[in-house]
Amino acid sequence: MKSFIEVAKPVVDSGIYMCAKFDQASCEALAQVQKLLGVENPVSAEKLHTTIVYSRKTVDLFPASGISEPARLVDVEKWDTKYGNTIVGVLESDYLHSRFNDAMDAGATYDFDNYKPHVTLAYDSRIEDISGVKRLLTLPVDLTIIKEDAESLDLDKTVEDITEHIEHRGESS
């Protein structure tokens, strides 16, 4: 069997981005969390994900499919990122830690001190104090990971590439 690198055959090593995707029920539960928090610029259901690998070096790790792995949303935090006030749901998941460790063992790079599994709920949210709205949530929220996707690392994604503004969601409320 060919390795991932043999299949992808990168000429210039742009790195690799791999993420875990959730089932429909999990995406609906996360959309409810977004709604309860009242976030602006929510990540759309089809773009909700958890980053596993964000490596400046391509590694030999195939994305998994046909899986059913549990994860739990256990907290919500505000992070200051290049996209503004980013609202993330902090996850507990042995599976995500295991896959991250697989990537690191395969030679992946990582720009942060620790791997903290999370799902981004909104970019440029304009929420300054998350503690006030966080109390509206009932945690934990059970989620199910059903597959992984991988692509070349793109360091120039815009907020429009990764979100869907609420006025485009088709919600009547």
From Swiss-Prot:
Residue numbers binding 3',3'-cGAMP: 17, 151
Entry keyword Hydrolase: yes
GO molecular function (one): hydrolase activity
Catalytic residues of the enzyme: 49, 51, 118, 120
Residues that coordinate or bind 3',3'-cUAMP: 17, 151
Keyword Hydrolase attached: yes
Keywords: Host-virus interaction, Hydrolase, Inhibition of host innate immune response by virus, Viral immunoevasion
GO biological-process terms attached to the record: symbiont-mediated suppression of host innate immune response
Reactions this protein catalyses: 3',3'-cUAMP + H2O = U[3'-5']pAp[3'] + H(+); 3',3',3'-c-tri-AMP + H2O = A[3'-5']pA[3'-5']pAp[3'] + H(+); 3',3',3'-cAAG + H2O = G[3'-5']pA[3'-5']pAp[3'] + H(+); 3',3',3'-cAAG + H2O = A[3'-5']pG[3'-5']pAp[3'] + H(+)
SUPFAM superfamilies listed in its UniProt record: LigT-like (SSF55144)
Top-level taxon: Viruses
InterPro entries: Acb1-like_C (IPR056175), Cyclic_Pdiesterase (IPR009097)
Family: Belongs to the anti-CBASS protein Acb1 family.
Described function: Counteracts the host CBASS antiviral defense system. Phosphodiesterase that enables metal-independent hydrolysis of the host cyclic di- and trinucleotide CBASS signals such as 3'3'-cGAMP, 3'3'cUA, and 3'3'3'-cAAA. Does not cleave cGG or cA4. Besides evasion of the CBASS system, might also enable evasion of the type III CRISPR systems that use cA3 signals.
UniProt name for this protein: Anti-CBASS protein Acb1
Organism listed in the record: Escherichia phage RB16
Gene: 57B
